[in-house]
């Protein structure tokens, strides 16, 4: 048995889009077959059926109504699938054989433009990447808005990952032979990004002609060849999927990576620039605080400003001056914001114009939006700052487009452009004439109905219409005896009625339907002419849209500054960051008003180059460091900042090493990740950079960690090519001695108050180093059981008392019912490597529940002494010969509620924001109140 003609056609089409789910149009449905059907039925929760196709077994099949396709397509694209739309290319009724079909569009995560599935305040970027020896280029496009950006640099994975993190593309287009290890790295860091591959030749083919035809501002001698390749590859992919050239992509914007403040992937995450650390949502981020925009365009632009802070003093100060002028003209600012609220998403509407998918209602939204532009231009003329004056000169009021739309389109047109009811009366004589004929015909129908009711005496008689039978007279069966014989021609019999026609009725039907059909055709033709005129002027509307989005951003920054009592920072060239009474912009928004403790900061490249911060955990060191970085970023985007006074030097890069989770899947421990991040910072930071280092060396033994932290500080301060402004938080109090030995190191600590054996974190950063870490007190605040806290204090006293003796003796408390006795003789301990070769490993008792204590002071002694470790157990048959070098174990059988302890052990505090830490602490305290 051979394949059916339809199935043969399906397989031929499928061959050209193997990586897509094929939506194959059959009548009023899109059908999917074979593996596509299995995937779609699972993802969309559709019933999987079968169809005879000429093979031995029925082909798996499922389908969806074509008019509801957008919803299903959106769900599949959101899940990362590509969809190929195969349409009927001819009228089935006019086709003698099998209907001609072809793919009209391929929808991918990076080329999807349905506004119902796009975030209005976030771009939907697609990226291309091209690698040539040691150089690479990247291009980013959003086909829904028409943006197209390109850059190039020396190839470093870190640089590429930073740009991916900045633009957050939904899809990346790569050359098909690129190394799989590089693709693996991308997928590992960004698992939700879709990867697509094209041939090498698609990056090169007809490169200059393609770019010249697409971009109004393209000059072949202006761009490096490698830049043109990534741009050409991306244009090829867009054309391949959209099946036409998009006129809204008409300008290529080249940017240099070094023209903006570099914030690497880890720093964007740690500083919570656009999403919070834990939930990966906007709330709790810097963007969340600063975004008071009134338009979708402004929301996207503000995100770009925050993702790409400036490093040139003049544009920064231009923005700051504009924000200041808005704050000095509150009434004018409010009028401006009120008009902004009435502006729709101009960029995405004209994007739909370019893709021929715009409807009449969206053009009415466009009309209403550009109708506000003359008022905005008038407001701009009232300002004096350079930025606003330039905007006032450049903004196009688009009055000709507004006039056309206002004259041509009904205020409330049909949603579908192929159903008529679009064109306004008086715009076209033929439309008016046909509408009159249609109206007169319907009046005739109404008069016919009244006449028949009167002449037959049937009050329930109706003249109705449907698409199958046209116009007809309907009479219920109860009244059939009243119908005069021979008056009507029977057309259809229903269960409770009869339907009739008359020659006169059918004649009028032809006139009415002819007028309606012709009217719909003419209205659609006029609509396409209007759409084409708008398409010819897309670049004008895009320029105006960009100015409106900039105005919206400035108004947003002014609103936030007013609401939160921000001040205008001074931008200096002294390599000095001086902040008086600075506040963390996010934390102060999520705690009760007035409770945030402000702090001063002074960092430069001379006497105050490295600020060494000591103090207990949870006291606010990390919050303070993040606060300095966020204030710097805010200043460089042109925002006012949360402080009493701020003098900010422009930074070229911001690096952070704050917390890390074990990357076990990649075979990297916390310490390995930490060292990799520190290495990256030391290799790439400059004297213009701001570096935040938190607890460097914490992931290894005390002496190793202390040595590494010490060496890092020396390298930063003594390397003439580095000397970056640095905030360095540590629990190694020994490092405070470096202030006397290394120029530029200054000791600071978090103030703590002790009252009746209780500690209170004052959150105030003060001059001088801390003399202790208060680790046990922090554990007590976290809700650890009293026996654990008391025993820890005993152990600490032993350790501190034995510091000047030759041995460390710790006898376990009897209340733990432990038989272990641990004696560590300081004179006989060897180094960690020697110990590991001398001690045979065994297992600890499996009958007891063990809790690991990793006290750094204990580990210090265990790793540095040079004698044999002896573990004696009174009730055991043999002496255990294994003792972990980096920790020792104590049994806690008496603790009944070990689930709470297990929860404490599993807290990933390194990846918590300060506010999340406080909430977790409160939760643990409540859970442990009943534990003795």
Swiss-Prot record:
A Pfam family of the record is MutS_I
UniProt-recorded Gene Ontology molecular function terms: ATP binding; ATP-dependent DNA damage sensor activity; damaged DNA binding; mismatched DNA binding
* A GO biological process held by the record: mismatch repair
Looking up InterPro entries in the UniProt record yields: DNA_mismatch_repair_MutS, DNA_mismatch_repair_MutS-lik_N, DNA_mismatch_repair_MutS/MSH, DNA_mismatch_repair_MutS_C, DNA_mismatch_repair_MutS_clamp, DNA_mismatch_repair_MutS_core, DNA_mismatch_repair_MutS_N, DNA_mismatch_repair_MutS_sf
Q: Which Cys-Cys disulfides exist here?
A: none
Keyword ATP-binding: yes or no?
yes
This entry carries the following GO cellular component terms, namely: cytosol
Transcription as a keyword of this entry, yes or no, is no
**Cited function:** This protein is involved in the repair of mismatches in DNA. It is possible that it carries out the mismatch recognition step. This protein has a weak ATPase activity.
The Swiss-Prot or TrEMBL record describes its family as follows: Belongs to the DNA mismatch repair MutS family.
The name this protein goes by in its record: DNA mismatch repair protein MutS
Q: Which species is the source of this protein?
A: Clostridium botulinum (strain Loch Maree / Type A3)
The organism that produces this protein has a lineage beginning with: Bacteria, Bacillati, Bacillota, Clostridia, Eubacteriales
**Gene name of the encoded protein:** mutS
